[in-house]
Amino acid sequence: MKLAITITLAILALCCSPASAEICQSFADIIQGLFLGTPASFEAAVEPFKPDADMKAATTQLKTLVDFLPKNTKDSILKLMDKIAKSPLCA
């Protein structure tokens, strides 16, 4: 469970690098699918990026881990991500 949270926050950190002034909408859709979508909808959101077999296996495993998180934990993570994305530190 902690692994899923750590990986997700690391992904978000990449999005808030000084090189990216705003979050790519596709990336935001993937994160939303990770936490709120079905496994099929999450796979569909990732598919346009043509992941190889290892990437697909990793994203499936991550989705499975996230799905085991309690709803209040997922909600809190999404709130934190939103707060980080809107922070002046990510501008």
Curated annotation (Swiss-Prot):
Expressing tissues: Club cells (nonciliated cells of the surface epithelium of the pulmonary airways). Expressed in lung, uterus, and prostate.
Keywords from the UniProt entry: Disulfide bond, Phospholipase A2 inhibitor, Secreted, Signal
A Pfam family the protein falls into: Uteroglobin
Gene Ontology CC: cytoplasm; extracellular space
GO molecular function, one term: phospholipase A2 inhibitor activity
Compartment(s) where it occurs, according to its Swiss-Prot or TrEMBL record: Secreted
GO BP term, pick one: signal transduction
Chief location bin: secreted
Function of the protein: Binds phosphatidylcholine, phosphatidylinositol, polychlorinated biphenyls (PCB) and weakly progesterone, potent inhibitor of phospholipase A2.
Similarity section: Belongs to the secretoglobin family.
Protein name: Uteroglobin
UniProt source species: Equus caballus (Horse)
